[in-house]
Amino acid sequence: MSKPIQMEKGVKYRDADKMALIPVKNMPTEQKEVLRKPDWMKIKLPADSQRIQDIKSAMRKNNLHSVCEEASCPNLAECFNHGTATFMILGAICTRRCPFCDVAHGRPLPPEAEEPTKLAKTIADMKLKYVVITSVDRDDLRDGGAKHFADCNREIRAQSPHIRIETLVPDFRGRMDVALEALKDNPPDVFNHNLETAPRLYRKVRPGANYQWSLDLLKKFKEQHPDVPTKSGLMMGLGETKEEIVEVLKDLRAHGVTMLTLGQYLAPSRHHLPVERYVPPAEFDELKEIALELGFTHAACGPFVRSSYHADMQAQGLEVK
C-alpha cells in the first residue's frame, strides 16, 4: 500500500497524485478502452498568433491565471484569438479534487491582496467589453473567496466603467450566507454556478459537492439580486441519461435560472474520468429546444460549448454552438 501524499503548501498536484486523494477511486483508463473521437469532435485548431501570445504575456506579467490554460480548455486558441479570456482568481490550486477537472489540487497560498487591482488593470489594458471571472474552490477561506470576487468586481468597474462582468463561482460549501453577504454590494452582471452533472453521478463526478446546495445558491442569489440573470452548465457524456438531464433543467428553472450551457465532457488525461459517450450534435440541438420550451431565455448547447465559451455572445442571446 502506497503512503498518502503529504501535501506541501503552494504545490500543484495533478493527474495520478491528484486522483489518489479521491474517496471514489477512478482507475487509469487503458488506451484500448478510450473511445475514439467521432468526426464532429475533430476540429482544426487556429494557428498560434500574436494575439494569443499577447494575452499569455499579460497574464504572466501580472501573475494572473486563466482557466483556459489551467483547465486545458479545447477552445483556448479560438477564444484568445477572439480577444477573450476567463480569468481565474485566488490562485491556481484548488482545495477540491474533482476527477473531471484538470486544475491542480493542493494546499493553496493565501489570496494575493493586489490581485483585484492587477486584474482590473490588465482587463483595462486589453480593452475588454465583457469579462468572465472564475476561481478555484477555496474551502480554506472563511467566505470561500467571495469577498475577493467582490473586490475584483469593484476594481474592474472602477477602471472599465462600461464593462459587463460574469462570475463563475464555486459552491461556497458551508459558507453560503457569508459568501452572499460579501457579494451583496458588488454583484456581477451575470451570476454563473455550474451543476456539472445529474445528481445520481455527484459522488463520482463532484465529490464534496451537493446538488441541492448548488441549486439553493443559485436561487438565493437570484432572490437577493432579481435583476441579475443566473446561469448554469452541465457536461454530457459522463454516464447520464437524457431523462436525467431534462430533470436537471426543470430543477434549474424551478430555482430561477434562465441561462444554460451544455457541452461534451472531454477527459484531460487517462487518470481522469473516462468519456462514456460522445453526444451527437443533433441531441444537443434537441436539448436546446427542450430548454427553451422550459423557459430558459438562452441555451448554448453543443459539443464544444463551455461555461465561458463566447460568454459575451451568450449574454446577448446570440447563437453559440
UniProtKB/Swiss-Prot annotation:
Q: How is the cofactor bound?
A: Binds 2 [4Fe-4S] clusters per subunit. One cluster is coordinated with 3 cysteines and an exchangeable S-adenosyl-L-methionine.
**Which reaction(s) does the protein catalyse, per the Swiss-Prot or TrEMBL entry?**
[[Fe-S] cluster scaffold protein carrying a second [4Fe-4S](2+) cluster] + N(6)-octanoyl-L-lysyl-[protein] + 2 oxidized [2Fe-2S]-[ferredoxin] + 2 S-adenosyl-L-methionine + 4 H(+) = [[Fe-S] cluster scaffold protein] + N(6)-[(R)-dihydrolipoyl]-L-lysyl-[protein] + 4 Fe(3+) + 2 hydrogen sulfide + 2 5'-deoxyadenosine + 2 L-methionine + 2 reduced [2Fe-2S]-[ferredoxin]
Q: Which pathway features in its UniProt record?
A: Protein modification; protein lipoylation via endogenous pathway; protein N(6)-(lipoyl)lysine from octanoyl-[acyl-carrier-protein]: step 2/2
- EC id: 2.8.1.8
Q: What InterPro entries is this protein classified in?
A: Aldolase_TIM, Elp3/MiaA/NifB-like_rSAM, LIAS_N, Lipoyl_synth, rSAM
Sorted alphabetically, which PROSITE patterns does this protein's record hold? Answer: RADICAL_SAM
Any idea where the Radical SAM core domain is? 80-297
Which sites bind [4Fe-4S] cluster 2? C94, C98, C101
Location (main, coarse)? cytoplasm
- Which Pfam families does the entry mention? LIAS_N, Radical_SAM
Per UniProt, the keywords (alphabetical) are:
4Fe-4S, Cytoplasm, Iron, Iron-sulfur, Metal-binding, S-adenosyl-L-methionine, Transferase
Q: Name one GO molecular function term.
A: lipoate synthase activity
Report residues binding [4Fe-4S] cluster 1: C68, C73, C79, S308
Q: Which co-factors does it depend on? A: [4Fe-4S] cluster
Q: Which residues form a coiled coil?
A: none
Q: Where in the cell is it found?
A: Cytoplasm
- The organism's superkingdom is given as Bacteria
The record's section on CDD domains has: Radical_SAM
**Record GO cellular component, one term:** cytoplasm
Q: What Gene3D superfamilies does UniProt report for this protein, alphabetically?
A: Aldolase class I
Q: Which HAMAP family match?
A: Lipoyl_synth
UniProt-listed NCBIfam families: lipA, PRK05481.1, PRK12928.1
Family to which the UniProt record says this protein belongs: Belongs to the radical SAM superfamily. Lipoyl synthase family.
Q: What is this protein called?
A: Lipoyl synthase
Q: Which organism is it from?
A: Vibrio vulnificus (strain YJ016)
Gene this chain is encoded by:
lipA
